[in-house]
């Protein structure tokens, strides 16, 4: 059956439930062929593609399927095994590969999986390339197949994680260590379960690990960046200096201070932006944030003389606005933070190292660094939905939004949007009084659930 353009790719690559379209072995083989076809359209000859994955059970079958499609077209593949998404971006550049592929559904449950594709420069491919890949998959016209002696070889790269560990450590100042710091680390049973403990331990920190025993079916399950309550308790229990929570593919970071308080992506962005400005390393005194960024955080950044460019939600949009505005730092509340001086995509480990460096150099605790940032009261609730009906077509939803806006007046704001990667509607309400914000958000949630709500599946 012929697919319409953009039926495969979403806001962050291809994603869906494993063994359901588009995340099937059959479609993955076609995607591998299509990636090869796009490379061969640029120029004939030898090409190589690196392939990494997180710890999902379904990663094995998608790894084999993609490699089969690529090698059938004459492409050499380099199999990295479990490695964070930013590790794939780095290895793609380091090995001078023509493309990189990460098999992951990021922060989604284990039953989902996805495919992210990087170009040779380590940036995620753009929409035009995605559309060309989709067109090839739909037509199954990948160009001439190679002769039997010219099919591609697949090689396992044994030192890929070691290279990434050394790269990550190199972003920390030479001569400095993490000696004396006790860190609670939650790797979400995901792609960082080996590399993250190694990075922090080799820099001489005392590391207490959680979420470092992947089973293939426990990635992001009540742990990691989406569930920081795990390390909140652990930081207090172990009298740790800081908690670090990464998501399943290692491109998000949420931290916890020594008092057990969550420090989200907005706060981390503020800390790092302030440091870069102080060191005169913040290009054009500008950072990129998103429409979800807390208004109090925006006020704080502006009080420092930092210009803030606002992008839609999603690390792809953040990166696009960074490149357009020549910004070196961008991030979002969920914990994606991009340091273009270090990597071409969000990197949770590298981001954590920058925050730890700031703590050490300023002789401050994490709570000291956040004390001057007054966040506005905000409620953010995720509502599982059966389908993504255009919100403007739902009269009852529009009605409650109007009512809530009238209550908030000019002292608050509402944001209602669908997730680009899950069947979820995000309800965000911001204002001046926490109890009012929570109540108004619940009012909106009740209406959204009544209109399009879905039962939560286990």
Swiss-Prot record:
Q: Which UniProt keywords apply?
A: Isomerase, Magnesium, Metal-binding, Phosphoprotein
Highest rank taxon of the organism? Bacteria
Catalytic site residues?
A: 106 (phosphoserine intermediate)
Binding positions for Mg(2+)? Answer: 106, 247, 249, 251
* Cofactor field: Mg(2+)
Write down how the cofactor binds this protein. Answer: Binds 1 Mg(2+) ion per subunit.
Query: Pfam families from the xrefs?
Result: PGM_PMM_I, PGM_PMM_II, PGM_PMM_III, PGM_PMM_IV
Q: Which reaction does it catalyse?
A: alpha-D-glucosamine 1-phosphate = D-glucosamine 6-phosphate
InterPro entries documented for this protein: A-D-PHexomutase_a/b/a-I, A-D-PHexomutase_a/b/a-I/II/III, A-D-PHexomutase_a/b/a-II, A-D-PHexomutase_a/b/a-III, A-D-PHexomutase_C, A-D-PHexomutase_C_sf, A-D-PHexomutase_CS, Alpha-D-phosphohexomutase_SF
This entry's Enzyme Commission designation comes to 5.4.2.10
A Gene Ontology molecular-function term? magnesium ion binding
Q: Which residues carry this modification: Phosphoserine?
A: 106
The UniProt entry's GO biological process terms, in alphabetical order, are:
carbohydrate metabolic process; peptidoglycan biosynthetic process; UDP-N-acetylglucosamine biosynthetic process
UniProt key word Calcium: no
Catalytic EC class: isomerase
Q: What does the UniProt function comment say about this protein?
A: Catalyzes the conversion of glucosamine-6-phosphate to glucosamine-1-phosphate.
Q: Which HAMAP family match?
A: GlmM_B
What's the family? Answer: Belongs to the phosphohexose mutase family.
Q: What is this protein called?
A: Phosphoglucosamine mutase
Source organism: Chlamydia trachomatis serovar A (strain ATCC VR-571B / DSM 19440 / HAR-13)
């Amino acid at each position: 059956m012929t697919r319409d353009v953009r039926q495969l790719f979403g806001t962050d690559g291809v994603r869906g439930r494993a063994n359901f379209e588009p995340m099937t072995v059959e479609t993955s083989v076609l995607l591998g062929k299509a990636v090869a076809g796009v490379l061969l359209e640029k120029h004939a000859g030898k090409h190589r593609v690196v392939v990494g994955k997180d710890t999902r059970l379904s990663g094995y079958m998608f790894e084999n399927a993609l490699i089969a499609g690529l090698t059938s077209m004459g492409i050499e593949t380099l199999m990295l095994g479990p490695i964070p998404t930013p590790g794939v971006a780095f290895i793609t550049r380091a090995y001078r590969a023509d493309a990189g592929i990460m098999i992951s559904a990021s922060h989604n449950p284990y039953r989902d999986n996805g495919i992210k594709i990087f170009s040779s420069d380590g940036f995620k491919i753009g929409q035009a390339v995605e559309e060309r890949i989709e067109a090839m998959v739909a037509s199954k016209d990948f160009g001439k197949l190679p002769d039997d002696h010219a099919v591609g070889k697949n090689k396992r790269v044994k030192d890929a994680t070691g290279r990434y560990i050394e790269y990550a450590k190199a972003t920390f100042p030479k001569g400095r260590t993490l000696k004396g710091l006790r860190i609670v680390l939650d790797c979400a049973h995901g792609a960082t379960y080996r590399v993250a403990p190694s990075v922090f331990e080799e820099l001489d920190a005392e590391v207490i690990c959680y979420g470092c025993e992947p089973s293939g079916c426990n990635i992001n399950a009540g742990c990691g960046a989406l569930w920081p309550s795990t390390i909140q308790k652990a930081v207090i229990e172990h009298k740790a200096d800081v908690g670090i929570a990464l998501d399943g593919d290692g491109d998000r970071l949420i931290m916890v201070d020594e008092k057990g308080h969550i420090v989200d992506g907005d706060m981390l962005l503020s800390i790092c932006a302030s440091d870069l400005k102080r060191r005169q390393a913040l290009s054009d005194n500008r950072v990129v944030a998103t429409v979800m960024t807390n208004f109090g955080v925006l006020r704080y950044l502006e009080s420092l003389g930092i210009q803030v460019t606002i992008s839609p939600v999603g690390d792809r949009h953040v990166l696009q606005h960074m490149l357009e505005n020549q910004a070196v730092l961008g991030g979002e509340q969920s914990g994606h933070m991009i340091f273009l001086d270090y990597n071409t995509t969000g990197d949770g480990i590298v981001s954590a190292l920058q925050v730890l460096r700031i703590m050490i150099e300023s002789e401050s605790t994490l709570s000291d660094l956040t004390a001057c940032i007054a966040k506005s009261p905000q409620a953010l609730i995720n509502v599982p939905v059966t389908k993504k009906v255009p919100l403007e077509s739902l009269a009852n939803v529009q009605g409650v939004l109007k009512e809530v806006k009238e209550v908030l007046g000019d002292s608050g704001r509402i944001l209602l949007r669908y997730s680009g990667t899950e069947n979820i509607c995000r309800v965000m309400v911001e204002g001046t009084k926490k109890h009012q914000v929570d109540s108004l958000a619940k009012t909106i949630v009740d209406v959204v659930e009544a209109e399009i709500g879905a039962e939560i599946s286990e």
